[in-house]
Amino acid sequence: MTLNLRVMAPNRIVWNSEVEEIVLSTNSGQIGVLPNHAPLLTALDIGIIKIRLNGEWSTMALMGGFAMIDNNGMTILVNEAEKATEINPQEARENYKMAQKDLAKAEGGKQKIEANLAFKRAKARLEAIDVISFPVSN
């Protein structure tokens, strides 16, 4: 049995197919979704989504949004999404290191918030390509 997954960003449809299982990061923690899941509407944190299709796992970095589960389908609306296959590993590592440094030297509320968001985005991109293992400490 499968469920239909649609991942949509403002400028494109990132994913639209039947899948076997989904694991994603919500604002209250990770959830797993299988066919016949109870209806749910949840906010998504910056993090990754794992998708199982034909016994193989694929990952994507999601930059926050919302997910709705209903009638063996999941629709995800995100600010931005990148498939692991679209992420340059070298660039992702460099961005992560830079974001770590920026977060460490951030001063003031606004700068700390912006640096933390940049760090979370960089961390999600690395997790999507399995360069770093779970969990990564801040």
UniProtKB/Swiss-Prot annotation:
Cysteines paired by S-S bonds: none
Endoplasmic reticulum as UniProt keyword: no
Annotated keywords: ATP synthesis, CF(1), Chloroplast, Hydrogen ion transport, Ion transport, Membrane, Plastid, Thylakoid, Transport
Compartment list: Plastid, Chloroplast thylakoid membrane
GO cellular component terms, semicolon-separated: chloroplast thylakoid membrane; proton-transporting ATP synthase complex
GO MF annotation list: ATP binding; proton-transporting ATP synthase activity, rotational mechanism
Membrane topology: Peripheral membrane protein
Annotated SUPFAM superfamilies: Epsilon subunit of F1F0-ATP synthase N-terminal domain
Keyword Cytoplasm carried by entry: no
Function: Produces ATP from ADP in the presence of a proton gradient across the membrane.
Protein family: Belongs to the ATPase epsilon chain family.
Subunit structure: F-type ATPases have 2 components, CF(1) - the catalytic core - and CF(0) - the membrane proton channel. CF(1) has five subunits: alpha(3), beta(3), gamma(1), delta(1), epsilon(1). CF(0) has three main subunits: a, b and c.
HAMAP family in the record: ATP_synth_epsil_bac (MF_00530)
Protein name: ATP synthase epsilon chain, chloroplastic
Name of encoding gene: atpE
